[in-house]
Amino acid sequence: AQDYVELSQEVDHAYCYARIQASRFAARMEIRLAELPEEMQKLKVPRLIIQPLLENALEYGLGDKEENGLLAVSYEEKDGRFYIHLEDNGSVTEEVLEKMRESLQNGANEKGEVTGMINIHRRLQLYYGGMAGLEIKRSVFGGTCVTICLEGEGKDVPFADRG
């Protein structure tokens, strides 16, 4: 399998997963998937950067929602950088958001574990450098917003840790 794919392929894969989950949980949540802008479609990205974050949002962000759950994916281009926003209306606390931000900074959570989110953050930083990676904040919907930050083009780096 390739380590890098076009963003359009990565989005297609993630959206297939999201549609399956949307049909499973249709009674208790809505999943809104924006169309990938044309200028972002050919960007090369590391594989599996979106689907695991969707899975996290469904399991941890919205897992306890009995009804009216919302998960939304949107895109933005600003100053030569590209952003993918994954937002939910889960009931995350400010303390948990802060712990998530700290684990990205430290490269491990408080238990010393490297989570899928940390792995994605590291791979994005390796590939793009600079300001690339994940950002975590409060969503406009009240839950968590995880933003994937991409630079214009990445560099071809070999993967040493395929853990």
Where are these regions (language model features)?
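Two-component histidine phosphotransfer core
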Residues: 1-137, 141-145, 149
